[in-house]
Amino acid sequence: MKRIKSGDEVIVIAGKSKGHIGKVLRVIDDAVVVEGGNLIKKHIKPNPQKPENKGGIITREAPLHVSNVAHYNPVTKKADKVGFKYLESNGVSKKVRYYKSNNEIIDRI
């Protein structure tokens, strides 16, 4: 099961964007793209076949390895580990993600 999903709030714990808090835009295998984190400048060559591509230097987010980010717990305002557990309700057990520091449930899977 993936511990980090698209839309989660994470904090960068290593690299040039260390300390940056942002939302996960997308997950790519073992990498995540964090909103406003790990910004790079990309040089784009003009393409006459595509009128929207004028060329130049653009700034965009590059992927970060999942080991360089951690879940951000808004209650403790710190990086936190995520665990999985099963909760039983009405005879049906559901798998949930929770913060290990304060056992607060993040979401149901």
From Swiss-Prot:
Record keywords: Ribonucleoprotein, Ribosomal protein, RNA-binding, rRNA-binding
Gene Ontology CC: ribonucleoprotein complex; ribosome
SUPFAM superfamilies xref list: Translation proteins SH3-like domain
UniProt-recorded Gene Ontology molecular function terms: rRNA binding; structural constituent of ribosome
Membrane-crossing residue ranges in chain numbering: none
Pfam families in the cross-refs: KOW, ribosomal_L24
GO biological process: translation
Record keyword Ribosomal protein present: yes
Role according to the record: One of two assembly initiator proteins, it binds directly to the 5'-end of the 23S rRNA, where it nucleates assembly of the 50S subunit.
PANTHER family: MITOCHONDRIAL RIBOSOMAL PROTEIN L24
Record-stated family: Belongs to the universal ribosomal protein uL24 family.
NCBIfam families: rplX_bact
Subunit structure: Part of the 50S ribosomal subunit.
Protein name in UniProt: Large ribosomal subunit protein uL24
Organism of provenance: Legionella pneumophila (strain Corby)
Taxonomic lineage of the native organism: Bacteria, Pseudomonadati, Pseudomonadota, Gammaproteobacteria, Legionellales
